[in-house]
Design a protein with these regions (language model features):
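Conserved ABC ATPase signature
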Residues: 78-82, 86
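Conserved ABC ATPase "signature" region
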Residues: 44, 49-74
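Catalytic Walker B motif of ABC-type/P-loop ATPase nucleotide-binding domains
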Residues: 103-106
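Helix N-cap at the start of a conserved alpha-helix in ABC-type nucleotide-binding domains
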Residues: 114-116
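ABC ATPase NBD coupling module
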Residues: 1-18, 48-56
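Helical segment within the ABC ATPase nucleotide-binding domain
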Residues: 118-131
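H-loop/switch region of ABC-family ATPase nucleotide-binding domains
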Residues: 139-140
C-alpha cells in the first residue's frame, strides 16, 4: 500500500516475497527442475506456465538455484524420489528463482531428520548472510533459533513474551 492505496506494481511486490512451507508443495510426478521453475509462474504468460514452456535462460536460472542448494544432479529426477531434506531445498530453490528478497519460512525443518535440519538451516543462514535475503522463520525449537538466528520474537498462546537478540535468551 501507498497512502492507503494498493500499489500499482502489486504483482512485482508479491514476487519479492517467497514462502517456504512445512510441507514442500512439490508435484511429485514432475521433475525437480519443473517444480523449481514454477517459482516463475507469476511473471509468465498463463499459457507458458500451464504448459511448462520455459526459456533456456529461465531453465539456467533454475539450474543455478538447484546448484546453490546442492541439488544440481537431481534436476531431472521426479520430485517424489527426493528425501524430505532434498524436497525442502528444492522448495527453497523455487523461491530463489522467483527472485524473492524476503523469505517467510513456516516450520521449514519440522518434518526433517537432524542432519537435514542442520543443512536446511545452514542454507537459510547463508542466503541471509551471503545474498542479503531477509528471513522470517517460524520455529518451535528454541535451540535452533539460538544457533541460527540473530533475533527472536517468541509467542506463548498468541501473546508476545520475548523480542530481542538471541544472545539475551536464557536456556
Amino acid at each position: 500500500q501507498s497512502g492507503g492505496r494498493v500499489a500499482s506494481d502489486i504483482r512485482a511486490q508479491r514476487r519479492q516475497v517467497g514462502i517456504i512451507f512445512q510441507q514442500f508443495n512439490l508435484v511429485g510426478r514432475l521433475p525437480v527442475l519443473t517444480n523449481v521453475l514454477t517459482g516463475l509462474a507469476a511473471e509468465l504468460p498463463l499459457w507458458r506456465a500451464v504448459l511448462n514452456r520455459f526459456k533456456t535462460e529461465e531453465q539456467a536460472r533454475a539450474l543455478d538455484a538447484l546448484d546453490a542448494m546442492g541439488l544440481g544432479e537431481q534436476a531431472f529426477q521426479r520430485a517424489s524420489t527426493l528425501s524430505g531434506g532434498q524436497q525442502q531445498r528444492a522448495a527453497i530453490a523455487r523461491t530463489l528463482v522467483q527472485g524473492a528478497r524476503l523469505l517467510l519460512a513456516d516450520e521449514p525443518v519440522a518434518s526433517l531428520d537432524p542432519e537435514s535440519t542442520r543443512r536446511v538451516m545452514e542454507l537459510l543462514l547463508a542466503l541471509n548472510q551471503e545474498r542479503g535475503l531477509t528471513l522470517i522463520v517460524s520455529l518451535h525449537h528454541v535451540s535452533l533459533a539460538q544457533h541460527y538466528c540473530e533475533r527472536v520474537v517468541a509467542l506463548r498462546e498468541g501473546v508476545l513474551v520475548f523480542d530481542g537478540p538471541t544472545s539475551a535468551l536464557t536456556p
